Amino acid sequence: METKVEIKDNLKTETNENAYIIAITKAEGKTIHVKITEEELEDLIGDALDGGDYWIGRIRAVDKEETKKYTTWSECIVHNLRIMLLDIESDEAYELSRTAFLEGIGKYILAFGEDLCTAEEESICMRKDKPAEIMKTDHVLDTGNIDANIADNMLQFGLFGELVYG
């Protein structure tokens, strides 16, 4: 069976936090549903950009006017704006979006295992635009154990599908 990462966004948790679900299907067919809140995602993106400073030379906005509303690059990404990451040596540009970063988290978990996920009792997220539509999660991302290096690796998985730097 093929591995797969699917993102479900536009969700609210039971405590009314904005959230995302990363559905990760492993080769043996088992799927886990990992919940990450918007706040956790913003922190991880900030850590990833800090952790990638050895290969990211510059960061550029794709939607320059829209990005002026926010104070950090990670806020821009969380609010579904895109940024360009320029390679420190070649100036080659790579586009980072919220979906790409979330997919990178899932691909990292597929590659390195579920150590960064904590199983939890089933929790519920509701679609913001369709509150009657309920999605269940069975894991949370253990962001307290993710440092800047791991976050950078997740970023690379999101951009390239594999580790390219470091």
Regions found by a protein language model. Give the residues of each.
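Surface-exposed polar/charged interaction patches
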Residues: A27, D47-G51, W55, V62-E65, ...
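Acidic, proline/glycine-rich low-complexity IDRs
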Residues: D142-Y165
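Amphipathic protein-protein interaction modules
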Residues: S90-G144
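Generic low-complexity, intrinsically disordered sequence content enriched
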Residues: L11, T15, I45, H139, ...
